[in-house]
Amino acid sequence: MLTRKQQELLLFIHERMKESGVPPSFDEMKDALDLASKSGIHRLITALEERGFIRRLPNRARALEVIKLPEAYAGNPQVRRGFSPSVIEGSLGKPAAPAPAPKPAPPAENASVVVPVMGRIAAGVPISAIQNNMHDISVPIEMIGSGEHYALEIKGDSMIEAGILDGDTVIIRNASTASIGDIVVALIDDEEATLKRFRRKGASIALEAANPAYETRIFGPDRVKIQGKLVGLIRRYH
């Protein structure tokens, strides 16, 4: 059985997706349920996931799939006629698909693979990131090695001392763990993504910038998910 707040959140997500196809943000969910902070939304989403009503989609910011509705609500014929699992994915109301693996390019003198560019990521103040496949780029095969990869466009200057500039394209190897000192894609509170150097501070995770103008940010380990590790960089000169 769901609590009143859990049911309110589930129905709000479902109805918003059915009405407009545009997912509610965490701020909108917080305001709709009249909660004081987004941490309450995170707890409700976790509870709904544990009870099998929603499923989080990996490697995507704010991505949820509505699997089922409460029995009383699902029994309403007007609702049931329009019900199908709904997906919240970034700013798009479309079903999410797993990021495709790199596709080998035709044999050539300089071998390359095609890697999907999945969106923009902040090298500065975290922003919502990792959305749909925007386009593909060809990457020298020696740059990436084995594993699944994707690319992100950099927005911000917090990693300039690591040689990563605003407008660069970074190549990321899909990974859920990191070693101290790795430059990683970190997803904070399942909502915001940023590119930072991975550190530990006691039991907490420290996301360290490579620019003295930005402070190192400290989070509990339950608030940060590693989405991948930096393996390469592409820069275009105009």
Curated annotation (Swiss-Prot):
Keywords: Autocatalytic cleavage, DNA damage, DNA repair, DNA replication, DNA-binding, Hydrolase, Repressor, SOS response, Transcription, Transcription regulation. It comes from the Bacteria. The record marks A123, G124 as: Cleavage. It catalyses: Hydrolysis of Ala-|-Gly bond in repressor LexA. One of its GO terms (biological process) is negative regulation of DNA-templated transcription. The active site is at S158, K196. Its EC number is 3.4.21.88. Pfam families: LexA_DNA_bind, Peptidase_S24. Belongs to the peptidase S24 family. NCBIfam families: lexA (TIGR00498). Homodimer. Represses a number of genes involved in the response to DNA damage (SOS response), including recA and lexA. In the presence of single-stranded DNA, RecA interacts with LexA causing an autocatalytic cleavage which disrupts the DNA-binding part of LexA, leading to derepression of the SOS regulon and eventually DNA repair. This is LexA repressor. It comes from Sinorhizobium medicae (strain WSM419).
